[in-house]
């Protein structure tokens, strides 16, 4: 059995029991490796060295900077289970993507800045209900992510204009034209 001794000072357990103060006083660095039956048993440490080690441990336990990271970056909330049909199913009116849909979309290569609006979801559901195709829940979410990506990119990321609004004329005269 191999082991690593972390100090150059080694003593047998019998020698330590007979005169521990002298053994620790001669120890370089205030630490002695104590052997029993030719194997390391434990370390004997002087009170001064123990105080140094505890101070070092306390210093290392404190953060190195005053920047604190938000815990929610490390703790993902558990999504509440939703009754999703098993296997493949046709689109139905009450279908909803998962609560962590935006994160999942990012995993699929679709960066969505905003959550799905009710209008976008209603349009998606209406289209696919009419198609009558069947897919797994994850596949429906992937289709929704791609649909949102294409729909939002077609207008430069801006929401679609209402076709019923009356446009206002531009009253600015471009350079080079007379007014």
Curated annotation (Swiss-Prot):
This protein's record includes keyword DNA-binding: yes
Keyword DNA-binding part of the UniProt annotation: yes
Keywords for the protein's UniProt record, in alphabetical order: DNA replication, DNA-binding, Primosome
Signal peptide: none
Domain of life: Bacteria
GO BP annotations listed: DNA replication, synthesis of primer
InterPro entries recorded: DnaT, DnaT_DNA_bind
UniProt region (Disordered), positions on chain: 156-179
Purpose of the protein: Involved in the restart of stalled replication forks, which reloads the replicative helicase on sites other than the origin of replication. Can function in multiple replication restart pathways. Displaces ssDNA from a PriB-ssDNA complex. Probably forms a spiral filament on ssDNA.
Subunit and partners: Homooligomerizes. Interacts with PriB. Component of the replication restart primosome. Primosome assembly occurs via a 'hand-off' mechanism. PriA binds to replication forks, subsequently PriB then DnaT bind; DnaT then displaces ssDNA to generate the helicase loading substrate.
The protein, known as: Replication restart protein DnaT
